[in-house]
Amino acid sequence: RVYIPKSISKQVLSKLKKQIATIKMGSPENFENFMTAVIHENSFDKLSRVIKKVKKDRDAKIFVGGGYSKSKGYFIEPTIVTTSNPKYYTMENELFGPIVTIYTFDDNKWDKTLSLVDETSEYALTGAIFCQDRYILEESVKKLENCAGNFYINDKCTGAVVGQQPFGGARG
């Protein structure tokens, strides 16, 4: 899930759309492909059901992607869902596939959004915040201290580096 302030949402969404268009998908034997199929048919079926649900719902829409096929593997296109509902299904449930949901919030509702981020799911493997304002960054880090197992500040979520950082545990 991604939370983006309204003041920069159009710019961010435009960049994401361009970047996703460059992702090559196909066989893992071809090293030009950045993405390959999802792990198994059950995963494919779950993710394709989610995409179908989004296409029918009023609270969300497919911004980019949304295609899938199991004719030559279990392929799900990289998909961005946008929603006006911060409690939408794809914001609260872990999908474990190439689908991300973006919620755009009013800039003046930053505190409320931080609470949403912290309360949305009892599970969160990784999280990150990107911010240029030191005050907001400091406040955010305090409020989100326990929101994810690994938390990055102005850096992409890369997951744990085994042997280099602690990993695992549970929220208190």
Report the location of each language-model feature.
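Catalytic cores of large soluble enzymes that bind and process phosphate-bearing ligands
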Residues: 4, 8, 39-46, 105, ...
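Conserved C-terminal structural/oligomerization subdomain of aldehyde/semialdehyde dehydrogenase
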Residues: 68, 75-172
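Glycine/threonine-rich helix-loop capping motifs at alpha-helix boundaries
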Residues: 6-35, 49-65, 83-90, 120-122, ...
